[in-house]
Amino acid sequence: MLQPSRRKFRKEQKGRNTGVATRGANVSFGEFGLKATERGRLTARQIEAARRAISRHIKRGGRIFIRIFPDKPISQKPAEVRMGNGKGNPEYYVAEIQPGKVLYELNGVPEDLAREAFTLAAAKLPLRTTFVTRMFGT
């Protein structure tokens, strides 16, 4: 699973996920992409589950590009622990997703196969997504 190798600080504040994606909004590595149309967060497990769904469907053909990385730690307190006594320990990592962000890209596969693979991957994700193709000149 994806997670940062080391961080300057172990814990991070909650923050707010606002705005739309301006960086990472175009298909730039592959021919086809899976783009988020909704705001949310993806855990490292969800990113990996979708990647596995894509790679199983395209078998040996093509190349997958993961355009997101879970770099935000989410802390949790253990079950049945009283309030107070500080913040919980980091349990997992998430990637904050804005609308318009390209999540995955595929190269070297036909369009119909890419569509099917991205449909399977989208079922593993908690966000609404859309299929996009590369605009030449970008």
From Swiss-Prot:
InterPro entries assigned: Ribosomal_uL16, Ribosomal_uL16_bact-type, Ribosomal_uL16_dom, Ribosomal_uL16_sf
Q: Enumerate the residue ranges of region (Disordered).
A: 1-20
Q: GO molecular function terms here?
A: rRNA binding; structural constituent of ribosome; tRNA binding
Q: Which GO terms describe its cellular component?
A: cytosolic large ribosomal subunit
* One GO term (biological process): translation
Basic residues bias: where? 1-13
> What does the UniProt keyword field contain?
Ribonucleoprotein, Ribosomal protein, RNA-binding, rRNA-binding, tRNA-binding
Q: Which family does it belong to?
A: Belongs to the universal ribosomal protein uL16 family.
Subunit text? Part of the 50S ribosomal subunit.
Stated role? Binds 23S rRNA and is also seen to make contacts with the A and possibly P site tRNAs.
User: HAMAP family recorded for this chain?
Assistant: Ribosomal_uL16
This chain's protein is named Large ribosomal subunit protein uL16
